[in-house]
Design a protein with these regions (language model features):
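Structural alpha/beta core scaffold segments of enzyme domains
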Residues: 1-341
Length: 341
């Protein structure tokens, strides 16, 4: 049996053995269970920080940024495996900024050790590594850490939601929850209930302890799954940070010396200022930035600026670079590692 709170308590015990004095407050912060940042609303009823139930199915909160690596689909599959929902019932949303979404796997990934070695470490070691990301709410993506962080955490979220929904159905039917089963987004007994019908009541019944499914029963994990973001990215309906628009928002495009490290002697912004939408050309010292009312105008304006670039302090082509490197070698040994014995 396991739960997210138990993992948190484990972190407290590990740190409690090695801290003293003022650092004890840090140990307390590690043991503290982060608040659920989600609230009931139009999106549905949250059962924990990662699972929202609504009439359309289940929305999984993926706290790692989707950058083409497929992490949103992976995290959703971890939840769906325990929650007993059909794949077409699953949606994914990116998590809001919140401590609950700290990335405990980042510290493990930063060790540059193979994942199989990280996975074989004692739980106490993993808890210690997770301490800093939790204290500082490091909700970051990178280092192939998303699955390291979420493999147990997301399954616990799905299992906890499943058992809460069963408890809600059992209360309505006046039976033991152990006699009920879940399948296809429903709790099934003498009477069946959809998850949406039970969500509001289940939100107050999330258990402290849940058992994770045996891998032999997995339907999704370890198998090829259709990516949840495939259709939106194929049809151009996916939204990204660059799609954000705010009242009075401006856009900028930066142009720097194409020779890395090279300076700028001067520039003429006249042509750029004639581009519709361009409002200003800013001298950055070693480059320029064009501010406009939209992205396209900013890009076109930056290309229209006449710039006198200075040369860089390195050779201009590969052949010249190779010549410099070759000239650095000498025929005589000029270093010594050891001189003994």
């Amino acid at each position: 049996m396991a739960n997210w709170k138990k993992i948190t308590r484990r972190s407290f015990l590990v740190l409690g053995a090695v801290v003293a004095g003022g650092a004890a407050f840090g140990a307390y912060k590690v043991a503290e269970v982060p608040e659920n940042p989600l609230r009931p609303g139009p999106e549905g009823t949250p059962l924990n920080p990662w699972v929202i139930i609504n009439a359309d199915g289940v929305t999984v909160i993926a706290p790692r940024a989707e950058m083409g690596q497929g992490i949103s689909t992976t995290l959703a599959a971890l939840v769906a495996e325990e929650l007993d929902v059909d794949w077409q019932q699953v949606r994914v949303m990116h998590g809001p900024p919140a401590q609950a979404y700290f990335n405990a796997g980042m510290a493990e990934a930063a060790s540059n050790r193979p994942n199989y070695q990280v996975a074989s470490e004692p739980k106490s070691h993993s808890a210690l590594l997770a301490a800093l990301p939790k204290i500082f709410s490091l909700q970051m993506t990178g280092g192939s850490s998303g699955t390291l962080d979420g493999f147990e955490k997301m399954r616990l979220a799905g299992a906890g939601a499943r058992e809460a929904l069963k408890a809600a159905a059992a209360r309505r039917l006046g039976v033991d929850a152990q006699g009920l089963k879940t399948e296809g987004g429903k709790v099934i007994g003498a009477q069946s209930f959809t998850y949406a019908e039970l969500a509001e009541e289940a939100a107050a019944l999330v258990p402290a302890e849940v058992a994770l499914r045996d891998p032999s029963t997995w339907r999704y994990l370890g198998k090829a799954m259709p990516r949840l973001d495939m259709e939106a990215k194929s049809t151009g309906t996916a939204t990204f940070g660059i799609d954000t628009y705010l009242p009075g928002m401006k856009f900028a495009s930066v142009r720097m010396n194409p020779r890395r490290g090279g300076a700028m002697k001067g520039h003429d912004p006249a042509a750029a200022l004639q581009v519709p939408g361009v409002e200003q050309v800013i001298d950055l010292g070693n480059g320029i930035a064009v501010v406009a009312t939209n992205t396209w105008s900013a890009i076109q304006g930056a290309e229209a600026v006449t710039v006198d670039w200075d040369v860089a302090d390195y050779p201009a082509d590969s052949a010249a670079m190779t010549a410099v490197i070759e000239a650095a070698f000498t025929d005589d040994p000029d270093s010594r590692l050891r001189d003994d014995g």
